[in-house]
Amino acid sequence: MIRKLTRGSIIAIAAVMLLLPFYKAHAGIPVGTWRAHPAYNDATFSLKAFGMTAVLSDGAIYLYDPSDNGLYTIDKTGGLGDTDIAAMGYCNSEQAVILVYSNGNIDLLYNDFTIYNFTDIKNNGTGSVSVNELKVIADKAYISTNIGLIVFDVKRREISNTYRFDTQVYSSVVFNDTIICSTDSGMYLGLDSDNLLDKNKWKKFSDIRFRTLFEFDGQLAGNSFINRIWTIDRNTAALKEKIKDDVTGLSLQTDGRLVLIQDTAVTFYNSLSDFTAYIFPSHVNDVMTDGDDVWACQGNYGLCRYSITNDGLVLKARMIKPDSPRRNWFHSVSWPQPGRLLAVGGCHNYQNINYPGTVMIYENDRWTSLDEDIPSKTGVNYQNLTEAVQDPSDPDHIFVGSTGQGLYEFRNGKFSKLHTWNNSGLSSILNDTEFNKNNYVRISALQYDKEGNLWMANNETDTILKVMQPDGKWFGLYYSEIAGLPTFKQLRFDDKGRIWINSSRYNPGLVCIDLNGTLKKNSDDKIKFSGPYFVNQDGTTEEISQLTFYDVDMNGEMWIGTNRGLFILKDPDSFIDDANPVFERVKISRNDGSGLADYLLNGVYVTAMYIDQGNRKWIGTLDQGIFLLSADGTSTLEHFTTSNSPLPSDNILSITENGQDGSLFFGTSLGMVEYGGQARDPEESLSESNILVYPNPVKPDFDGYVTITGLTEFSSIRIMSNSGHLVHMGTSNGGSYSWNLTDMNGRQVPSGIYHAIITNQENNKSESTSITVIR
């Protein structure tokens, strides 16, 4: 069972979990609340704490209680101060798990499950902090970073000292009365009794660098950057190679033993001359011993439990990990059918960074991923995926584009075929070598049309638009206006059958193509490309370098996201024939008496967009989190960032909504979170049988929104007291409405029975429902 911890005691979990099934049955998660979806698929480190095993996996933490096989997760929604844990340790004297994040932020998780957040290192004002190592000695945490060695006093919850070396500190160790640091420029030692804040007190005694320093068997030792173990004479700096084989990991156990890991081989040392080795069934990242039990972190196999017997190593349990996404990367997300989220973790490889091929499905509260055992079958790397699309006639048939290897086809979750330059209508950018032919077939912007044809962009080739027909045959459509352009991110059909695509960089712009009713004949087609210069309603010309996203709202207006902010194409129907289309900017009055206004989100790099059932705009940005805008954009209703919400990152990659329950899913560079939104798919007609209110009754300890679902679009809601007074009124967001239990003056309403009168947009039908409030 997975249980989510809060800042309060563990007893509070039962109450929280009792509530969740009620909300789940009706609304996903409550309006205004959050649920994190971190990956727990690469277990790398574990330690014993509070009678449980704490596991670090994909930069997140979970705990396993062997007494009842309970799994406990904790994240930003449950009180952690940050995301992406770089190192974890345990302070026995303070009964605290120490979590050091990749940005230097620190959380102390105590045995009563309270959390103390320490931000001084993160907010040090000297630039970004990256963490290389954490060692806990007594009540001190020694944190090796890119800015030096930081000593954190766990008991006093403060920084004791910061020793700066003007270079990376990879590892540190306290050996007798000396602190020894391995840095990018060699090893330094300093007497603990000296004023080590004075750099001159540190003595450089070797040019050799070590990834990890440690003390064992009365000797100073280190794991070098070529993964060999050496002993180090601290006086002469003489090195003796002790273990030549490739050491991929090591740990010092609480019982004093040293554990060295070499892929699947794990050796337990009582001393450097007294050891026992075991072979594990798969790669091991870390090992923790507890009597005769051995807890191994084995990557995708999660936490595994073994016993040491006279017959050797015996597996007792494996795959001890919470259900979670495969990875923390959500480049593209969509809902191809009700109840199914389809996510792709990849990129367009702008920075020449290769992301493992990742396609994930979230359905029925479970995460699964598509087959990844592909390179052995294709001979090319499976990486940098761009977008996935589900066959509208077969939910088990999925196509996925990639930045270099072509179009992947999956059936029933298993890899079926790679469509590439030599077996399809697709083309490679480079044709000089076999390697280049196989690795420069760039496919993105996948979309099915009503006839079941699969459209896509074959980037940076002469013929950009390629189409695979239902019978597997291919054809291409050539347009000189877009030939050779490198990056198309979206391809969509409007209600008139026109194609809209966006060239996102290097001559970015908006493209509209009218096929004129002839699918394969492009001589009678009309095409319009506009960019990279946009002219706004003031006649001002603005140059964009990125056109990242577009979407059409309920008023038929196209909202366009760029590196300069938002633009609006008021009449998309006239765009293709308009010689000088106007891309309007929303203006926000300064309200300072000057009569001046500023452009909405001017200069803000927009990366993602979603228009919900209330016609509100959810805007994702490169480094400023998420904005929720009113339907016309003139009001900012919410602004979520990492500092005021559980967002794991302010770099937003994707946004989508589960229209059934109104939950928003935000994909970021550090993982996904879900937010209980106020809008959902509307009903076609207003009917008492569809209307549902929850929670109802409202209990005294409830602090949230009452949600009314089953409404038609733009229904009006009037909430009346039992005596007939108007208490509250509003308009539905799609098929739902959320009430914060306040009256027209913003005051909390008292106990009583309230009546919601709901009228459809046409004002020809009304229904009512009751809400009981108990204070």
Q: Where in the sequence are the language-model features?
A:
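Bacterial Sec-dependent N-terminal signal peptides
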Residues: M1-G32, W455, W500, R775
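Carboxylate-rich, polar loop motifs that coordinate divalent cations or form catalytic acidic clusters
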Residues: H26-I691, L726, I757
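A generic structural motif
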Residues: I374, N422, N733-G734, T772
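Surface-exposed coil/turn segments at beta-strand junctions on protein surfaces, enriched
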Residues: S393, D449, D494, G710-T712, ...
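Glycine-centered coil/turn sites that cap beta-strands in beta-rich domains
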Residues: S685-R718, S736-W739
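Short, glycine-anchored, charge-dense loop/turn motifs used at functional sites
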Residues: S716-V727, G746, Y754
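Short, surface-exposed loop/turn motifs with a glycine/proline- and acidic-biased composition
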Residues: S732-N763
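Edge beta-strands of extracellular beta-sandwich domains
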Residues: S766-I771
